[in-house]
């Protein structure tokens, strides 16, 4: 019996895969996400610092002012601790932690291509910068400055500021995106898994179609 020979089938090269190459659209999406992140962070930071300046200028420390009756009050305090007055005796530790987290956010930001993740990191960055500015430049000294807190809800014992609110919202958004399986590129992880599994049968089919070599 004659031997049937077929040309060897070449495996697809990973280098030529368009999914692995940086396309202009992905680059544009990355730049757009960074712009959103920067705008959100700047807005949070400015709102936080402006409201703190207004409180310091118009209220005395410890003063309380009703804004929405018993629902929301202004209560000016100087907080040497973390968010919601946690750890008031370790201001310098929170300053170092804030610098470290801030550096991580800036280092990780270029990987973001999702609008939702950009908003998340913008809220986190703006909030961190707001409170870190207080710790670095307010009294009693550099790195141990007291954070200006002024918002109080009777249902909560803590007094906080807009930077704290932004950080809490970023954590809530993080939980939501994580539970939904949305990655930094905006894609769901299960959708990516489905794409990989749908590509596998094609490779198996090509292997099955390859004729066997028979010898006499």
Swiss-Prot record:
Belongs to the peptidase A8 family. Its EC number is 3.4.23.36. InterPro entries: Peptidase_A8. Residues 207-216 have a biased composition (Basic and acidic residues). This is Lipoprotein signal peptidase. GO terms for molecular function: aspartic-type endopeptidase activity. Keywords: Aspartyl protease, Cell membrane, Hydrolase, Membrane, Protease, Transmembrane, Transmembrane helix. Residues 1-21, 189-216 are annotated as: Disordered. This protein specifically catalyzes the removal of signal peptides from prolipoproteins. It is a multi-pass membrane protein. The chain crosses the membrane at residues 31-51, 89-109, 114-134, 159-179. Pfam families: Peptidase_A8. Pathway: Protein modification; lipoprotein biosynthesis (signal peptide cleavage). GO terms for biological process: proteolysis. It is found in: Cell membrane. It catalyses: Release of signal peptides from bacterial membrane prolipoproteins. Hydrolyzes -Xaa-Yaa-Zaa-|-(S,diacylglyceryl)Cys-, in which Xaa is hydrophobic (preferably Leu), and Yaa (Ala or Ser) and Zaa (Gly or Ala) have small, neutral side chains. It is an enzyme of class 3 (hydrolase). The active site is at residues 149, 164. One of its GO terms (cellular component) is plasma membrane.
């Amino acid at each position: 019996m004659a031997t049937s020979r077929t040309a060897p089938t070449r495996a697809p090269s990973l280098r030529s895969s368009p999914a692995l190459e940086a396309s202009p659209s992905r680059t544009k999406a990355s730049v757009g996400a960074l712009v959103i992140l920067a705008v959100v962070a700047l807005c949070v930071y400015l709102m936080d610092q402006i409201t703190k300046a207004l409180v310091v200028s118009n209220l005395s420390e410890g003063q309380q002012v009703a804004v929405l009756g018993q629902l929301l009050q202004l209560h000016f305090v100087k907080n040497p601790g973390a968010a919601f007055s946690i750890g008031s005796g370790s201001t310098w530790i929170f300053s170092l932690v804030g610098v470290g987290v801030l550096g991580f956010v800036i280092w990780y930001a270029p990987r973001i291509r999702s609008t939702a993740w950009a908003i998340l990191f913008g809220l986190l960055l703006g909030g961190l910068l707001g409170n870190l500015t207080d710790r670095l430049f307010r009294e009693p000294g550099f790195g141990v400055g007291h954070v200006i807190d002024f918002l109080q809800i009777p249902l909560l014992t803590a007094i906080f500021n807009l930077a704290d609110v932004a950080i809490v919202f970023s954590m809530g958004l993080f939980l939501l995106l994580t539970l939904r399986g949305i990655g930094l590129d905006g894609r769901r992880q299960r959708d990516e898994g489905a794409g990989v599994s749908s590509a596998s049968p094609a490779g198996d089919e090509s292997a099955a179609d390859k004729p066997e070599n028979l010898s006499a």
